[in-house]
Regions:
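Amphipathic alpha-helical segments
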Residues: 90-101
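Bacterial N-terminal signal peptides
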Residues: 10-20
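Generic short beta-strand segments
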Residues: 54-60, 121-127, 163-165
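Short secondary-structure boundary motifs at beta->alpha junctions and helix caps
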Residues: 72-86, 152-199
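Bacterial N-terminal signal peptides that target proteins for export
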Residues: 1-10
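Surface-exposed short loop/turn segments
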Residues: 23-38, 102-157, 167-169
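A structural "domain/chain start" motif
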Residues: 22-89, 198-213
Length: 213
């Protein structure tokens, strides 16, 4: 083995040891979403509505106790990525913040005062990593099915899957790395939701029907 190859082998070994050392304990993360200050989305173009949000956990039962796996330098799972807040609550709070930032009001379903009802089936909220030779590729994913109903007659106005994905490269995967990609996936999901043509058309329909009542 020449000197250059030997150095590469040593560096790869050190990298593997470093990754392994960081992977032995559970990671605790606090994902969340805060609307960008001073910025509104296309949701603001819709007349203010009273909206009820329901989020149901439809994730794979084998993933419901965590939001990711930590791995050692050889790709073996060694610990869990645990969220301090239930993922359904994280998504509910994010949607609530986005609607309120765009002049809409969130109401409880049982109050029966909603102009529109938004039902979310959370399919996956996950952080993952792929180990390459000298870096780690971190990935966050949020998959959900959405349904928008008229709050008065429960008529379905939109139904579709939506996704938010975020990737970044790092040298080491500490707790902040997992939280970062989970936040990124949540941000991308909310961004996609608030700009989706079907979502906007459904809410505009509700606003028009409200004006006629």
């Amino acid at each position: 083995m020449n000197t250059h190859s030997h150095k590469l082998a040593v560096l790869a070994l050190l990298f593997s040891i470093a990754v392994s050392g960081c992977a032995l304990t559970d990671a605790h993360v606090k994902p969340g979403f805060t609307p960008e200050s001073g910025k509104r989305s296309p949701l603001s173009t819709i007349s203010p509505l009273a909206i009820s949000i329901q989020v149901e956990d439809q994730r794979n039962p084998g993933e419901q106790d965590r939001v990711g796996d930590k791995k050692n330098g050889f790709g073996a799972v060694t610990a869990k990525v645990l969220s301090d807040k239930v993922p359904t609550t994280i998504l509910y709070d994010a949607l609530k913040a986005e609607f309120e930032n765009n002049a809409h009001k969130i109401v409880q379903t049982e109050d029966r005062k909603a102009d529109a009802l938004i039902k979310i089936g959370l399919k996956r909220y996950w952080s993952d990593l792929a180990i390459h030779f000298f870096d780690l590729e971190m990935k966050g994913t949020l998959d959900a099915d959405i349904e928008i109903l008229n709050g008065v007659d429960q008529n379905q106005l939109a139904s579709k899957p939506l996704n938010g994905t975020f990737r970044e490269s790092r040298q080491i995967a500490l707790e902040g790395a997992f939280e970062g990609v989970l936040n990124g996936a949540l941000f991308e999901f909310i961004r996609t939701f608030s700009r989706d043509p079907n979502v906007l058309d459904a809410l505009r329909t509700v606003a028009l029907q409200k004006e006629k009542r």
